[in-house]
């Protein structure tokens, strides 16, 4: 389990809920959780949406999410 997935589940969010709030596809969230690279702006949106539920900011850099340009 990735740190991102752990935080998402601790926040009580499903993949679908987070993808809707972050305005990214379910596939993007699934890739992040499988430690596959995604575009940096999408990773940032996912982290911003997750941060709102956690009550503190997390970034894709600190979570080690792999990104491509």
Where are the model-predicted features located?
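A short, Lys/Arg-rich alpha-helix, primarily the initiator
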Residues: 1-11, 17, 21, 58-60
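Short, charged recognition helix plus adjacent turn
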Residues: 10, 31, 40-41, 56-69
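Long, compositionally biased, intrinsically disordered segments
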Residues: 15-16, 30
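Recognition helix of helix-turn-helix/homeodomain-like DNA-binding domains
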Residues: 23-38
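Short, basic-rich loop-to-helix N-cap that marks the start of a DNA-contacting helix
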Residues: 35-48
């Amino acid at each position: 389990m990735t740190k991102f997935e752990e935080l998402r589940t601790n926040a009580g969010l499903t993949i679908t809920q987070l993808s809707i709030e972050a305005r990214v596809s379910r596939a993007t969230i699934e890739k992040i959780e499988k430690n596959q690279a995604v575009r940096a702006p999408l990773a940032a949106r996912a982290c911003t949406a997750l941060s709102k539920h956690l009550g503190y900011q997390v970034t894709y850099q600190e979570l080690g999410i792999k990104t491509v340009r």
